[in-house]
A protein has these predicted regions:
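Short active-site-proximal "capping" loops at secondary-structure junctions
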Residues: 38-39, 57
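Vicinal oxygen chelate
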Residues: 2-13, 32-33, 40-43, 48-53, 57-81, 99-104, ...
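Active-site-proximal flexible loops/turns
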Residues: 19, 61, 112
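Amphipathic alpha-helical segments
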Residues: 15-30, 77, 81-83
C-alpha cells in the first residue's frame, strides 16, 4: 500500500521571487532561491514547502485547486494578511463555528483561512 505525503505546494508566477517573498511573510517562512527568477522555495517550520516557478503565461480562469489554512484567531489573521496585501474575495459561515475567508495573493491565486469548527 502506498502512502502519499504532501511535500510541496507549487505556484506558477511571472515573478517567483516576489511572490515567494510575499508568501514567506504570510506563513512565517524562509526564502530559499534555488534558481533565482526561475524556481524559489519557501521553507516552513511545519507542513509542506511552498514552491514558486516561473511561468510566463498564467493559466486563465478560476483556480481549480487552492490552499486552505487554519488560524487560532481568524479575525486577527485576516487583518494581518490584508495588511500584507492579500485581497479578500469572500466569506463563508457554515455554522457551528466553521467559517472561512477567501483571499487572493498578489498574483491572484486563491487561498482560504478558516476555523476548524466545533
Amino acid at each position: 500500500m502506498t502512502s502519499l505525503t504532501v511535500e510541496m505546494i507549487t505556484f506558477d508566477s511571472a515573478d517567483p521571487d516576489r511572490l515567494a517573498a510575499w508568501w514567506a511573510e504570510a506563513v512565517d517562512g524562509t526564502v530559499n532561491a534555488v534558481a533565482p527568477g526561475e524556481f524559489v522555495l519557501v521553507l516552513r517550520p511545519q507542513g509542506p514547502r511552498l514552491g514558486f516557478q516561473r511561468v510566463d503565461a498564467p493559466t486563465p480562469g478560476k483556480n481549480r485547486v487552492h490552499v486552505d489554512f487554519t488560524a487560532p484567531d481568524l479575525d486577527q489573521e485576516v487583518d494581518r494578511l490584508l495588511s500584507l496585501g492579500a485581497v479578500e474575495t469572500g466569506r463563508q459561515d457554515m455554522g457551528g463555528g466553521f467559517r472561512w475567508v477567501v483571499f487572493a495573493d498578489p498574483d491572484g491565486n486563491a487561498f482560504c483561512v478558516g476555523t476548524g469548527g466545533d
